[in-house]
Regions:
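Multi-pass alpha-helical transmembrane bundles in non-GPCR membrane proteins
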Residues: 1-207
Length: 207
């Protein structure tokens, strides 16, 4: 383990990849987290013409934050950086949930920003106090988001296709995330253990 990482408490929510001595403890999971940077660029380019007051303009920034915090966590496998990584992920799920509630008519669009800020402060505090609460909140929010997406007005085949694609990517990705933390389906020997793991696939699918 890199000397600097020994100063931090090891995470209790381990992932599959075996440790490697050096600066980057889990190389495959660290490198795969860079997929969020690619997603950030794609969203930024596709939303460049959107009004700056729209929630989607926050997505590229949040995705960059997720990429940075995820790289830091997987490189160190430190508990504190896992908390920060989870807080960043919750920023995205909070934004998706609040905007989904607005688009489905549960709240007015004028309320999305104060509600997003309030929920983000609350989820960050809860995650800082107990990492497990952060995982629980992210799971419940994801279920609520999928529920809202299912009930969005779907007036054309393109929208329906986009929603199906999102759900088909996120659902198996989330299952793999859970399996990885449970130690199920892990590759433990040889170079393959540092190439393909459930958490690696989660990064790619969720990005």
């Amino acid at each position: 383990m890199f000397a600097a990482w020994t100063e931090f408490e090891r995470t209790h929510f381990n992932t599959c990849e075996p440790d490697v001595a050096g600066l980057i403890i889990h190389p495959a999971e660290t490198v795969s987290a860079l997929a969020y940077l690619v997603a950030a660029v794609v969203v930024w380019r596709t939303s460049a013409s959107v009004d700056r007051t729209f929630p989607v303009r926050l997505c590229p920034f949040i995705l960059v934050v997720i990429a940075v915090t995820s790289v830091l966590f997987h490189a160190s496998s430190a508990a504190i950086f896992q908390k920060i990584d989870l807080m960043a992920i919750l920023l995205l799920t909070n934004l998706l949930l609040v905007t989904s509630l607005a688009h489905t008519g549960y709240i007015t669009l004028n309320w999305w920003l104060p509600l997003f800020v309030g929920v983000s402060v609350a989820t960050s505090l809860l995650t800082f106090l107990e990492t497990g609460l952060g995982f629980l909140i992210a799971t419940l929010e994801s279920i609520a988001i999928i529920y809202c997406w299912h009930h969005l007005p779907r007036k054309d085949s393109v929208t329906k296709h986009q929603l199906r694609t999102l759900i088909c990517l996120i659902t198996p990705g989330a299952v793999l995330l859970g399996l990885g933390h449970a130690g199920i389906g892990c590759l433990t020997n040889g170079m393959a253990a540092h190439i393909l793991q459930p958490h690696v696939v989660w990064h790619i699918l969720s990005s």
